[in-house]
C-alpha cells in the first residue's frame, strides 16, 4: 500500500447492535474494494476481522480489529468493533481512534439498544456518524420501518442518501438521492436504470421526490448561502449536495442513512463512494487538545511537519509475538528506531517494528504519517499512553471505560498455579481496561471483575488457551462480621501443670460494644493483680481472637475490651499463658454478650429507562433494598434510583439489570456500612460458615 498524507486517510469505526452485520459489512467493503480476493463468512469462521478462536467459536466479534482498503484517492482504516455489551471496552477503543462511525442497523430488527449505545458513544466523543441499514436481502427486512424508527429515535438530523426501490417485497434497484439516479445490480455490478414511478413510490411508503427534497432541506441548513439558494427555489448542484452533507456531518447536524446487502454486495459500491466523498479525513476532524508538562492546554493539529505526537488506544498481550500497541498518530510522523517520550510516564524509549494489520495478517510499514493508525511491536507502553517527540511533550486525555461490575471468585484448578494466574491477569489487564483482578482481604479470595458473563467466559478462556492455566469460578463469599450487643465481665483462666514449670495466667476482662471497627483495648488493673509486662500478651491474645467470631467465624468489630483484674504465679506465669487466658475470656465473653451477625450494606445508584422504574423498585424490594430516592437522569428517558442493598443480594444484579432493560441500564455499587443480619437469615449463614469451637 502506498503512502498517504493526512488529507487522504479516513479512519472508520463500524459499530452497532450485536448481530446487525458489522463484520459482514467490513468483509463486503474489503472485498468490493479489492483489498481481499474472497468474501468471508461468519458461519464459515473465515472473515478477516473475526479471527481469534473465541470469535470463531462464538460467531461474533469479541475484539476490535484493524483492516484497511483503498477507495478513490483514499486509504481507509476500518475498525470493526464488537456489539455485545460485555465487550463495550473494545468499542470505546475503536470509536475513540476513528474519525467517523458507521452504525449498522438491521433491516430486519431495526433500531435496538446497541444502536443507541453506539450513537451515544460516537456523539460523546464528537464523531460524525452515518447509519447503514443492512440485511436488506432478508425476506422480513423493511427499510421504510427502519427509516421511520431512525427519524423518531434520532431526530431531524437523519437524512437518507441511498434508498432501496421495492416491488413485491423484493429490492429491484437503489436510488442515490445525491446523484438522483437509480441503479440495479446484475452479477454484482451496478447498472443505471429508470427512476421509480410515483405509483411505485407510493407502494413503498416513501416518495422518492420527497426524500430528494428532504436532502436539499438538510443541506440548506449547513450554510447561509445554500439556505438562501434553497428558499429562492434553485436546485443544488451535486457538488453542493456533497459538500453540504460533508459539512453537516462534521458539525453534527446531518446523519446520513444508506443501505446495503453484504451478502450479494448490492449498495456496497455506493457506500464506498460515500466514504470517499462524504466522510471527513483526519486533517479536518482530528485536531486534538493536549496538555503540556506545565499543565497548559495546547491544540495539536494534524500536520506532518509538526513534532510527532500519538496516542495508544489499544493493547494486545500476545504471549508469542509480545505486546502489540495500536497507535493513532495525531501529528508529525512515527518511524521505527525513533526515540520518543512517553508523556504519561515520563520515560523515553525507541520505537520498534511498525506494522499495519489486515485482520491477523501483519504488513511491515516504514513510517506512519499523521492521521494514520499503526501497530508498534514490543513497545513498553500501555493503553491511554501518549508518546511524542521531545521537541514538544504533550499528553492527551485518556479514554473513559465502563467499570467492571460482574464479580466472581477465581481459584486455580491445579495447585501451584496461583502465580501463573497473577502473571497472566497482569498481561490481560494491560490489554483490557474493563477487567480487574485483586485480593479481597476480608474473604481472602481473588476476585475477577468483568462487564458480564460472556466477558468472564472470554477471560477464563484466554487464561486457559493463551496462558495455559485453568481456573474455577464461584460466587464471591460475603464478608460478614460479628459484634456484641451488651456489656459483660468474664474470667479467663489458663492453668496447666505437667512436671517442671507449669503455665498460669488469669484475667478478668470487661467486654462492651463500641463504634470502632478495630479492637479497643484498655487496662484498669489495680494493685498489680496482673503485672504490666503481661498486658501486651493479653492484648495480643485478644487481637488474634477477634479474627474469628463465635457464631460463624467471621471477624469481630465494634468490640472494646478492658482488663480489670486477674492473678499470676511468680514461676508459672508467662506471656503465652496470659495470651491463652485472654483467648479463653474472649470466647466466654462473646457467648454471654449476645453476639450478632452483621452483613455488609452497599450504596446503589442504578439508571434505568423510565418504563422500567416500577420493575426495578419491585426488584429492589425483593432484594431487601431500601429505596432512598429517584432522580431524573441527564439522559432523556432514564431515571436514577438510589438505594441501599445488602451485598449478599447483588451477586446476579448485573445480569438481571441487563435482561430487564435490554442492556440500557447501568449502575454503581459501593460498600457503605454493616447492619445486623435479619433473624430469619442468621441460621442459614451460620450453618454454611460454622466454625468448630
State where each predicted segment sits:
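Structural and coupling elements of P-loop NTPases
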Residues: 1-693
Amino acid at each position: 500500500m502506498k503512502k498517504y498524507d493526512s488529507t487522504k486517510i479516513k479512519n472508520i469505526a463500524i459499530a452497532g447492535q450485536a448481530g446487525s452485520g458489522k463484520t459482514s459489512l467490513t468483509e463486503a467493503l474489503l472485498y468490493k474494494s479489492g483489498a481481499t480476493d474472497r468474501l468471508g463468512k461468519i458461519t464459515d469462521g473465515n472473515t478477516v476481522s473475526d479471527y481469534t478462536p473465541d470469535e470463531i467459536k462464538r460467531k461474533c466479534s469479541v475484539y476490535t480489529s484493524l483492516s484497511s482498503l483503498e477507495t478513490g484517492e483514499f486509504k481507509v482504516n476500518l475498525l470493526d468493533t464488537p456489539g455485545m455489551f460485555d465487550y463495550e471496552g473494545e468499542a470505546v477503543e475503536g470509536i475513540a481512534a476513528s474519525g467517523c462511525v458507521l452504525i449498522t442497523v438491521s433491516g430486519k430488527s431495526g433500531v435496538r439498544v446497541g444502536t443507541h449505545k453506539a450513537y451515544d458513544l460516537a456523539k460523546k466523543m464528537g464523531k460524525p456518524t452515518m447509519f447503514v441499514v443492512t440485511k436488506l436481502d432478508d425476506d422480513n427486512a423493511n427499510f421504510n420501518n427502519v427509516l421511520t424508527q431512525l427519524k423518531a429515535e434520532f431526530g431531524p438530523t437523519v437524512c437518507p442518501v441511498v434508498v432501496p426501490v421495492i416491488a413485491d417485497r423484493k429490492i429491484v434497484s437503489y436510488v442515490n438521492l445525491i446523484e438522483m439516479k437509480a441503479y440495479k445490480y446484475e452479477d454484482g455490478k451496478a447498472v443505471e436504470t429508470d427512476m421509480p414511478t410515483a405509483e411505485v413510490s407510493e407502494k413503498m411508503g416513501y416518495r422518492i421526490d420527497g426524500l430528494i427534497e428532504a436532502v436539499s432541506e438538510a443541506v440548506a441548513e449547513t450554510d447561509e448561502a445554500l439556505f438562501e439558494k434553497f428558499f429562492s427555489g434553485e436546485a443544488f448542484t451535486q457538488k453542493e449536495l456533497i459538500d453540504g452533507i460533508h459539512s453537516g456531518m462534521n458539525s453534527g447536524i446531518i446523519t446520513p442513512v444508506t443501505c446495503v446487502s453484504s451478502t450479494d454486495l448490492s449498495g456496497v459500491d455506493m457506500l464506498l463512494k460515500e466514504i470517499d466523498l462524504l466522510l471527513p479525513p483526519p486533517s479536518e476532524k482530528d485536531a486534538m487538545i493536549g496538555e503540556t508538562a506545565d499543565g497548559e492546554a495546547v491544540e495539536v493539529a494534524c500536520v506532518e511537519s509538526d513534532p510527532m505526537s500519538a496516542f495508544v488506544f489499544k493493547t494486545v498481550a500476545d504471549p508469542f509475538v509480545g505486546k502489540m500497541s495500536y497507535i493513532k498518530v495525531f501529528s508529525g510522523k512515527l518511524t521505527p528506531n525513533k526515540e520518543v517520550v512517553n508523556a504519561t510516564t515520563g520515560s523515553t524509549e525507541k520505537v520498534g517494528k511498525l506494522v499495519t494489520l489486515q485482520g491477523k495478517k501483519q504488513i511491515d510499514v516504514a513510517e506512519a504519517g499523521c492521521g494514520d493508525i499503526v501497530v508498534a511491536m514490543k513497545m513498553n507502553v500501555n493503553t491511554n499512553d501518549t508518546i511524542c517527540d521531545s521537541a514538544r511533550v504533550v499528553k492527551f486525555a485518556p479514554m473513559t471505560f465502563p467499570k467492571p461490575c460482574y464479580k466472581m471468585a477465581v481459584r486455580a484448578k491445579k495447585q501451584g498455579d496461583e502465580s501463573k494466574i497473577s502473571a497472566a491477569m497482569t498481561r490481560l489487564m494491560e490489554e483490557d481496561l474493563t477487567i480487574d483482578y485483586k485480593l479481597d482481604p476480608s474473604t481472602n479470595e481473588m476476585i475477577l471483575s468483568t462487564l458480564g458473563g460472556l466477558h468472564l467466559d472470554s477471560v477464563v478462556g484466554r487464561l486457559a488457551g493463551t496462558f495455559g492455566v485453568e481456573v474455577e469460578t464461584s460466587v464471591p463469599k460475603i464478608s460478614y462480621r460479628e459484634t456484641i450487643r451488651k456489656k459483660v465481665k468474664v474470667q479467663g483462666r489458663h492453668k496447666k501443670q505437667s512436671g517442671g514449670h507449669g503455665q498460669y495466667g488469669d484475667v478478668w476482662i470487661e467486654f462492651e460494644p463500641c463504634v470502632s471497627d478495630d479492637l479497643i483495648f484498655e487496662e484498669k488493673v489495680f494493685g498489680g493483680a496482673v503485672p504490666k509486662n503481661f498486658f501486651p500478651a493479653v492484648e495480643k491474645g485478644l487481637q488474634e481472637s477477634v479474627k474469628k467470631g463465635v457464631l460463624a467465624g467471621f471477624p469481630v468489630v465494634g468490640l472494646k475490651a478492658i482488663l480489670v483484674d486477674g492473678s499470676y504465679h511468680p514461676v508459672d506465669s508467662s506471656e503465652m499463658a496470659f495470651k491463652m487466658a485472654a483467648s479463653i475470656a474472649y470466647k466466654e465473653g462473646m457467648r454471654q454478650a449476645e453476639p450478632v451477625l452483621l452483613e455488609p450494606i452497599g450504596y446503589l445508584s442504578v439508571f434505568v429507562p423510565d418504563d422500567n422504574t416500577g420493575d426495578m423498585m419491585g426488584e429492589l424490594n425483593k432484594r431487601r433494598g431500601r429505596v432512598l430516592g429517584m432522580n431524573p437522569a441527564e439522559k432523556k428517558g432514564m431515571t436514577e434510583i438510589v438505594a441501599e442493598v445488602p451485598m449478599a443480594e447483588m451477586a446476579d444484579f448485573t445480569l438481571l439489570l441487563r435482561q430487564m432493560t435490554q442492556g440500557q441500564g447501568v449502575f454503581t455499587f459501593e460498600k457503605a456500612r454493616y447492619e445486623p443480619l435479619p433473624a430469619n437469615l442468621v441460621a442459614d449463614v451460620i450453618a454454611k460458615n460454622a466454625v468448630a469451637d
